[in-house]
Every structure is written in C-alpha cells, then in structure tokens.
C-alpha cells in the first residue's frame, strides 16, 4: 500500500476507534451494583416498606446498602461518592487502608462483614463520619483486632458501636474527643477493668487524686447490654468515669455492685431484663440520677424493707413489664422531681386503685397501658394536676366519664385505644381543655357525635376505630390537622351541610364500605396533603371517590391506596395538581387492558415524582403507561407475577427516572425483554435494583425459577440492536465531520484533526527519522550565501566531536540541475526535520526567501509536533515585517529564535544553542 494511502487508512481507523470508545463510554457507564440498593430517603421515606435495608439517622438522605460483599474495593468502586449512609454485609476479614477514602460525605457507616482486623489507616479520609457500627449477629462473639490509632482520623465521630464482637486482643485504642456514645453489646466483657485496658483515655488514673486528662472524650452514653459474663464491678473499676447514661440491659450485673465502682455523675441507668426483684436502694448515692429504667424484671413490690428508696432528682422511672399489683402510699412523695412514670404491662387492675396520698405537682407523663384495668374511678387522677400525657391503651375500660378525668386540665395526649369502650358519655372531655391528641382506635363504638368531642379547644390529632360499623356525626373539631378512621365493615359520614375540614392535612380511612349521607352532600378538604385509603375495592371506585372528594385536592402531595380483595378496581385520579407520591397496592388491573388502565390512571398526574406499584397484576408494561410522567424520579414494582416488558419501553430510557426498583417481580421468559440486561447494567443516569436476581417463567405452571438474565443470555441474540445502532451512528457522524474538516471557516477543527493525525502517526509505529533525507533545510538569500557556506555550514556538517554531523539541504548545492526550483524546494522541505531561515533585510526582500518562510510556516501550523522552524537574525529587524508574524509568535518557542545582530550572542554560544535545539527537534520527531 502506498505511503499516502496508508496514512489515510490509519487516520480513518483512528476516527472509528475514537468514536467507538466514546460510544461505549456513553452507553457503558452505570451505578447499578449487584446486591446493592441505593436510596434517597428524602425522595421517598416509605421505601423501606417495600425493600428492607439498613436504618439511617435523622437528617441523612442518600443511602447505599450492599450485601454479599466479598471484594470491598470492587463493591465500593461503583457506590456514589456523595453517599451519606453506607451499610455493608458480607465477608471481609481485613479492612484495608483507605478503604473508604472516596466517600468524603459519609456520615454513617454500618459494617456486618465478619471483620477480624482493622488497620490504622482504614478510616482515613472520613472527616465527616459521625456514626460507626460493627455488627455481628450470631450466637457466638467474633474476635476483632483494632489498631490503637484506627479511629484517630475520625474527628467528627460521635457514636461508636460494637455488637457481637470480642476485643480481647486489642488494647490502648484511641477514641476521638468528639465521641459521645460508646456501645459494647453482646461482647466478652467480664469486668469493668477491661474498659481501662481497651480505652485508657476514658478512665482516670486509679490514684486517690483524680486528674482529668486533657483531650479525653466525654461520654454521654455507655451501653454494655447483654454482656452475659459481666457479673460484678470491682472497687474503683470505673473510678473517675463521668457518664450521663449507663445501659446494662440483659446483664447479670446487679445495681448494688455499682456502689463502689467509682462511677461519677450518673444521670440515666437502664437495668432492663437483669432479673432484679426489687427497686435498688443503694443507687441513692447517685444524687444526680434523673432516669431509671427497670423494665422486664421480677419486681412485685416497690417497697424495700418497709421503706421506699428515695431518688430526689429522679425525673423518669420505668417499671414496665414487671409484676406490680399495687402502688404504695405516698409513693410519689419520695420522688418529688418525677415527670415520667411508665407502669405499663403490669397487674394493677381490674380497678385502678391509687393510694389517697398519690399526688404529684410535677408528673407529666403516666403510662398505665396493658394493666387489665376495667374502670378508672371518679377523681382517681385528680391530684395529678400537671399531667400532660395519659396512656391507657390495651385495657378493658368500657366507659369514661368527665369525673374520671377531672383535674387533668393540662392533659394534651389521651390514648384509650384497644379498650372495650362502647359509648362515650356526653361531656366526658369537658375537663380537658388543653387536649390536642386523642386515640380511640380498636374500640367498640358504633357512632360518634361531634358534640361528644367538645371540650378541648385545640384538638389537632384524632384517631377513631371500631370493629363493626362507625357512624360519624357533625360537628367535628374545626382545628383538626390529622384524622384516622378505621372500621371493619363500614364508615358512614352523616352530615347535613357541606361542612369542610378547613385545616385537615392528613386523612386515613380504612374500611370495607365508605358511605356519605345524604347522597347529595359533599365534604371539602382544601388543605389535605396526605391521603391514605385501605379497604375493599369498591371503596376506591371512581364513583365513590368523586362523591367523597367532589372537588380538587389542590395541596395533596401523597396518595396511598391499598386494596384488601382481588376484585377489579375502577379508579380515576382527578383534581390533584400537586401530587408528588403515588402508592398503589392490590388494585387488580385485568391484564387484557392493564396498559390502557394504567395509562389512563397516570395521565392525570404528570407532575408525579414517585410511583410505587405493588400487587397490581399488571401483566404488561409499555411506553404508553409512563410517557406522560416527565418529572418521575423513582419507580418501584413490587410483587408482580408474569410481568411482560414491552420492547417499546426502550423509547422511555432517555427519560427513565433516577431510581428504578424491582422487588419480588417475576417476568415472562421472552426475548422481547432482551434489552433489560444492557439497560440495567449500562443505564447512564438510572440506578436499577433487583433485576440481577429476578426470575422468569414460561407459563403459569412453570416453577423452574430460571434467572431472567440467564434465559436472555442463553436463548436470545445478544447485542445485535446495540451494535447496529453503534455502526449507523459512527457512519452518520463521519458524514458530518469529514466535510467540516475541509471547510475553511472551521480552521480550529482542521487543527484538531491535524493533532489527532499526528498522535496516530506516532501510535502507528513509524520511525519518522528514516523518512527524512535531511536534518535541516537552510533558507537564505544570495547576499548571505558566503556567510552561510563559510561560517554556518562547516559547524553543522563537521563530524563529531568537532561538529554535530547534521545532514543539511542547501538550495544552491543540493537542488538538481535542470529541476524546477519550486518543486525541488517543496520536496526538500518536506524531507527535512527542521527549517532554518537566515533573515536579513536582503532576505526579506527576496521573493524566494519569503516563499520558503511561508511554506515553512504552513508546515509548522498544519503538522504540529512533526516539523520545526528556526529563525536566525543576522542583523536587527522589525519582526512585524515577517509574514504571518502573529501566527508565528503563537507557534514558536523562545529557543526557536537566534539573534546574532550587533554581537548579542557569542559565536560559540550560538553554535551550542543551535546544536541543542536541532538535536531536541530530532528527538521530538523520533
């Protein structure tokens, strides 16, 4: 193949390769990760209802949860860098150095990797990390070795937790000064002295005079729960340790053992499930103790040796799930500061018998739930004048009168759920003017009159529930913000005029039948933002909803519908201009017309951002179902069987939402869905979850559980459409680019093409030096010929070491006799590695010198990196007289100019400089 044709072929091949790489890059990038889920809790907080993943923390939104992790680096490589919550589950014995350095925004890290070793630089770069958890959920503890300085770089760490790990082989671990919560649950602690070995900065020296260590962390909470070998605390084991909270749930350690431990300033102590049988009196030594949790123990009597332990600073006391049957007289007198008392799940029934002396001016919260109470006697709570919350759920109370609640004028929350209440007596809330929250779920009420809810002036949250039917009569409280109504059979609103719920923001209805009487009356919800409907299909019919919601819901943002039966649903969304989240569950769309129904349902809510579809029996999906959802950011399919993905859904890929989840979805085995795999793994802007483990079935009786991707790889042609698209795209792009390169108006494109051509020329492996006959072409005029031949040429052509040994091309010497000078000049300059122009006033006046300078300038611009131009000034000249001087000034470097005028440079120095520049030009050309 001729040389010119070979160069053109290489150039075209270069274009094809570059375009192929660009195309593969554009279509191949994705952040879909096997066994990982990426979620934005700010976008859809209810996602965990459909897909379980690790818990987050308040204020954190972008979450990544990965399971079956074996290669940590490979898994983390595709997790978004701005992840705030990262949960990892799998098998990674050793955490390498800088394992999480990419995640500068990470604030919560939960590791369930069965890790046995952590290096000193594992967590380097996590300056924002606040929560760090090491979890091992197994009956036996796992040994974990921690380098002493492994947490040194975590300057913002506030919570550190170890669950199911033994730190036996670790010691002298540095804890950041920002640490506030330390947890060692279900570990191998046998005594408190182990803490001093593990974390010496926590404890002061055991000398009699405590010296606070500068920079030591100040713990608010120390959780040592379920350390089954921790049975006693030795003398001064915790000497000098200052804590707000100490949690010892599930340990055999008795509270009495803490007396001589040296623990200072304890505010909260939890001894849940420790097996104690009486309220410890020895803790009164902690005069600042404010909270004590003694739940799930064996306490039958609060009395101890006939006296009640006195906790003068105690504000919270929990005795839930014990065996209490009575409360001693003057019980609250010994707790003058008590504000919250939890006595739930005891045996204080059937009648609440409170001692006559039981009163408190500070008690604000009282929980008497699940105590088998049948009645609250008149005035039983009248002495609790400051009570704000009263919890009586799960008892057997059948009725309450205003005398039962007399004296509770500060009460704000009243919970009477899951009782046997059948009738509400008139005025029973008359003594509760401050009530804002009332819970009557799970009762046996048959009707509720609005007049029965009178008394509270600012009732905002109301929950009503009945097993059979529930009739609701006006007037309802005008200040309601949240209303939840449940009835097993029917909810019936009996109204006489279109009285609106002016301020209601959250409405939940759960029933089989929803009725509104009289039929021609409507209810208005102008402020409704969240609507939840649960029940049988006919409650969701268009006719029912239009009667109940006849006008627009202008502020509705979240609509949740969950059906309880398998009948078809006739549903139509209307008048919801601000709907952002739509959740549909168990609405049986018949597969024959499923696409049409879903399309009709969604076309009225084009502003939708989150769409969750569960148990809908969709059977078939096509692009027409979602083409109206331009703002969709999250799409979830849950529990669908034999789902067919129409191939025209590929048209929807450019506007596919940012998150697409498939949870427990079974597809049909058909090649029409072959595009799913390439889309799921190469989706440029979409995270896809659940497809890699989805199965497909050939028919209704197929139980083979064939993986969808395995079926597509085995039975369907792979990638034919993609490569066809890629080929046509490249050809079309070539037809566009090639004319532009030759267009004179697009000179920058021509220069870019030249640069690519040069790089490819070198990549093709050409030995450029072998293609040149001369090292330097010298351009000069006749007046300067004598100086060139006598002074310049001998220095450059002389053999080393005296000279450089360059091959020079001189027009007067090397042009063939009888050859055309123009052709010889063009050919010679093209075969020379560099061009040296000797410039004087006579040279600038010479047509041939000007022509040679122009030709050399052209080669310099058209072939950058492969040709060089050197200018030698023998006399002072105005450089503006040079042809295309401004272009030359951009392309030439400082070392490309040589000035011998007026003896500015010594001859020897000039020769050395010229030799070095010519030698460097030769190396660059090679």
Swiss-Prot record:
LRR repeats lie at residues 240-263, 264-286, 288-309, 313-334, 337-358, 362-383, 386-407, 410-433, 434-455, 458-479. It comes from the Eukaryota. Pfam families: LRR_8, TIR_2. The keyword Metal-binding does not apply. GO terms for cellular component: membrane. InterPro entries: Leu-rich_rpt (IPR001611), Leu-rich_rpt_typical-subtyp (IPR003591), LRR_dom_sf (IPR032675), TIR_dom (IPR000157), Toll_tir_struct_dom_sf (IPR035897). Keywords: Glycoprotein, Immunity, Inflammatory response, Innate immunity, Leucine-rich repeat, Membrane, NAD, Receptor, Repeat, Signal, Transmembrane, Transmembrane helix. Residues 772-922 form the TIR domain. GO terms for molecular function: NAD+ nucleosidase activity, cyclic ADP-ribose generating. Gene3D superfamilies: Ribonuclease Inhibitor (3.80.10.10), Toll/interleukin-1 receptor homology (TIR) domain (3.40.50.10140). Glycans are attached at residues 46, 73, 342, 396, 402, 506, 520, 620, 699. The keyword Transmembrane applies. Belongs to the Toll-like receptor family. Participates in the innate immune response to microbial agents. Acts via MYD88 and TRAF6, leading to NF-kappa-B activation, cytokine secretion and the inflammatory response. This is Toll-like receptor 11. It comes from Mus musculus (Mouse). The lineage of its organism: Eukaryota, Metazoa, Chordata, Craniata, Vertebrata. The gene is Tlr11.
């Amino acid at each position: 193949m001729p040389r010119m044709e070979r160069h053109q072929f290489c150039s075209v091949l270069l274009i094809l390769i570059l375009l192929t790489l660009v195309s593969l890059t554009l279509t191949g990038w994705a952040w879909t990760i096997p066994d990982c889920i990426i979620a934005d809790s700010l976008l859809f907080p209810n996602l965990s209802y459909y897909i379980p993943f690790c818990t987050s923390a308040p204020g954190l939104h972008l979450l990544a949860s990965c399971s079956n992790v074996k290669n940590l680096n490979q898994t983390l490589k595709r997790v978004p860098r701005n992840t705030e919550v990262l949960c990892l589950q799998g098998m990674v014995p050793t955490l390498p150095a800088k394992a999480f350095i990419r995640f500068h925004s990470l604030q919560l890290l939960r590791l369930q990797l069965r890790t046995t070793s952590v290096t000193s630089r594992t967590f380097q770069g996590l300056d924002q990390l606040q929560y760090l958890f090491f979890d091992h959920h197994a009956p036996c503890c796992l040994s974990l070795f921690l380098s002493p300085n492994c947490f040194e770089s975590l300057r913002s760490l506030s919570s550190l937790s170890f669950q199911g790990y033994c730190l036996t082989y670790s010691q002298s671990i540095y804890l950041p000064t920002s640490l506030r919560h330390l947890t060692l649950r279900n570990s191998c602690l046998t005594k408190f002295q182990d803490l001093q070995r593990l974390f010496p900065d926590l404890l002061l020296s055991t000398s009699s005079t405590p010296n606070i260590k500068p920079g030591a962390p100040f713990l608010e909470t120390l959780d040592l729960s379920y350390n089954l070998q921790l049975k006693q605390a030795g003398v001064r084991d915790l000497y000098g340790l200052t804590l707000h909270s100490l949690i010892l749930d599930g340990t055999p350690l008795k509270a009495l053992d803490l007396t001589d431990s040296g623990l200072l300033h304890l505010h909260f102590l939890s001894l849940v499930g420790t097996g104690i049988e009486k309220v410890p009196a020895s803790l009164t030594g902690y005069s600042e103790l404010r909270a004590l949790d003694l739940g799930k123990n064996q306490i039958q009597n609060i009395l101890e040796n006939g006296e009640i332990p006195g906790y003068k600073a105690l504000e919270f006391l929990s005795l839930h799930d014990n065996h209490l049957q009575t409360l001693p007289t003057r019980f609250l007198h010994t707790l003058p500061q008590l504000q919250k008392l939890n006595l739930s799940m005891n045996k204080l029934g059937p009648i609440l018998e409170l001692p006559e002396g039981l009163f408190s001016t500070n008690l604000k919260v009282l929980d008497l739930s699940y105590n088998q109470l049948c009645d609250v006697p008149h005035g039983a709570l009248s002495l609790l004048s400051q009570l704000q919350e009263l919890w009586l759920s799960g008892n057997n109370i059948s009725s309450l009168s205003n005398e039962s609640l007399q004296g509770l004028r500060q009460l704000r929350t009243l919970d009477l759920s899951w009782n046997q209440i059948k009738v509400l007596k008139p005025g029973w809330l008359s003594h509760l003017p401050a009530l804002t929250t009332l819970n009557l779920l799970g009762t046996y009420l048959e009707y509720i009159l609005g007049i029965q809810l009178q008394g509270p002036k600012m009732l905002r949250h109301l929950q009503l529930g009945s097993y059979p039917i529930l009739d609701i009569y006006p007037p309802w409280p005008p200040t309601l913000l949240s209303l939840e109504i449940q009835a097993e059979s029917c909810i019936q609103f009996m109204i006489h005029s279109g009285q609106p719920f002016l301020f209601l923001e959250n409405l939940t209805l759960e029933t089989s039948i929803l009725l509104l009487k009289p039929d021609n009356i409507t209810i208005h919800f102008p402020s409704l933002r969240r609507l939840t409907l649960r029940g049988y299909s006919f409650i969701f019919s268009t006719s029912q909803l239009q009667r109940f919601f006849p006008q627009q819901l202008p502020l509705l943002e979240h609509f949740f519908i969950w059906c309880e039966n398998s009948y078809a649903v006739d549903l139509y969304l209307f008048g919801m201009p601000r709907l952002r989240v739509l959740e549909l569950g168990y609405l049986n769309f018949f597969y024959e017309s499923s696409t049409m129904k879903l399309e009709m349902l969604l076309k009225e809510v084009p502003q939708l951002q989150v769409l969750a579809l569960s148990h809908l029996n969709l059977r078939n999906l096509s692009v027409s179902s979602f083409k109206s959802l331009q703002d969709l950011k999250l799409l979830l399919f849950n529990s669908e069987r034999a789902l067919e993905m129409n191939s025209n859904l590929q048209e929807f890929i450019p506007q596919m939402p940012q998150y697409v989840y498939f949870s427990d979805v079974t597809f049909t085995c058909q090649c029409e869905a072959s595009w799913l795999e390439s889309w799921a793994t190469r989706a440029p802007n979409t995270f896809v979850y659940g497809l890699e483990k989805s199965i497909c079935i050939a028919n209704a009786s197929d139980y083979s559980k064939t993986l969808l991707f395995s079926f597509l790889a085995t039975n369907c042609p792979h990638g034919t459409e993609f490569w066809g698209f890629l080929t046509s795209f490249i050809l079309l792009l070539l037809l566009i680019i090639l004319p532009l390169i030759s267009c004179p108006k697009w000179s920058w494109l021509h220069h870019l093409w030249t640069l690519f051509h040069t790089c490819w020329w070198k990549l093709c492996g050409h030995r450029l030096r072998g293609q040149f006959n001369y090292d330097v072409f010298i351009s000069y005029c006749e007046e300067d010929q004598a100086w060139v031949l006598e002074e310049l040429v001998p220095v450059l052509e002389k053999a080393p070491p005296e000279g450089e040994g360059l091959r020079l091309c001189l027009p007067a010497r090397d042009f063939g006799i009888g050859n055309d000078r123009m052709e010889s000049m063009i050919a010679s300059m093209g075969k020379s590695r560099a061009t040296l122009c000797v410039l004087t006033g006579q040279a600038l006046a010479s047509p041939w010198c000007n022509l040679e300078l122009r030709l050399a300038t052209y080669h310099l611009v058209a072939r950058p990196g492969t040709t060089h131009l050197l200018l030698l000034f023998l006399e002072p000249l105005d450089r503006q007289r040079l042809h295309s001087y401004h272009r030359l000034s951009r392309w030439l470097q400082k070392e490309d100019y040589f000035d011998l005028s007026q003896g500015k440079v010594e001859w020897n120095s000039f020769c050395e400089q010229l030799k070095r520049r010519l030698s460097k030009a030769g190396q660059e050309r090679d």
